[in-house]
Every structure is written in C-alpha cells, then in structure tokens.
Amino acid sequence: MAKDTRGRKKTARRSVSEGVAHIHASFNNTIVTITDRQGNALAWATSGGQGFRGSRKSTPFAAQVAAEVAGKAAQETYGVKNVDVLVKGPGPGRESAVRALGALGYKINSISDVTPIPHNGCRPPKKRRV
C-alpha cells in the first residue's frame, strides 16, 4: 500500500501570551479548554482522558489533573502566561481546576461564572429516589 505523500499542513507556532481557560464542570466529568482571545482552542484535557473512569472522573483531583495537563500543554506550545477563567457547570471540580491553573504559574486576570441558567425553560429531571 502506497503511503500518502500529501501529509498534514504544519500549523505555524504562534506566540499567544493571553488566553481564556474554559472549565466545564459537570457532575460526571470536567473538561478544561485553553483558548486564545478569539476562541480558537490551544489545548484541552478531560478528567476521563487522564485515565479516571466511573465515579473517579467526577472528583476534584481528576479535575486538577486535567487542568494541569491542559495548562502545561498551552504553556509549552504557545507560551500562554495570563488567563481569564470562565467556569461553567455545578460540578465538584470547579475550584480545584482554577487552583491548579494558578499553581502552574498562570496569572489569573479574572474568574467568571458563565453557568447557563434557564428562565424557566425545559422541565428538569425528576428527583432521584435512592
């Protein structure tokens, strides 16, 4: 079988000093995405992608590890130094992910809660009976 000679187009390594860290913390998983100001993704990581499975995915420690992985990737590849943090969702990994980014040496300019709140939209799921 002949090898495809076209190959992938190399993306130019650009230097991005300011970025936005999007932390989506659901009850089951935590997704951390670091983007530039325009919203183009630079690096991302999830709790499940770091090897945590089942109920361990939704722990604060799993969110911390995901934030460290995404943060290191954005720092090493693009040189991101300052971030605005946007936190979405009610999950347990909210604060620990923000703390992990601060511990990596990021200067956190602002922390905003952008959790979507319905103005009486869809009917919520019924209460759990355990």
Curated annotation (Swiss-Prot):
Cited Pfam families: Ribosomal_S11
Keywords from the named record: Ribonucleoprotein, Ribosomal protein, RNA-binding, rRNA-binding
Any one Gene Ontology BP term: translation
One GO term describing the cellular component: ribonucleoprotein complex
UniProt xrefs under SUPFAM superfamilies: Translational machinery components (SSF53137)
PROSITE patterns linked: RIBOSOMAL_S11
Record InterPro entries: Ribosomal_uS11, Ribosomal_uS11_bac-type, Ribosomal_uS11_CS, Ribosomal_uS11_sf
Molecular-function GO terms, alphabetical: rRNA binding; structural constituent of ribosome
Classification via PANTHER family: 40S RIBOSOMAL PROTEIN S14/30S RIBOSOMAL PROTEIN S11
Family as reported in the entry's similarity comment: Belongs to the universal ribosomal protein uS11 family.
Protein's job: Located on the platform of the 30S subunit, it bridges several disparate RNA helices of the 16S rRNA. Forms part of the Shine-Dalgarno cleft in the 70S ribosome.
The protein's assembly and partners: Part of the 30S ribosomal subunit. Interacts with proteins S7 and S18. Binds to IF-3.
Name of the protein described by the UniProt record: Small ribosomal subunit protein uS11
Name of the gene this protein is made from: rpsK
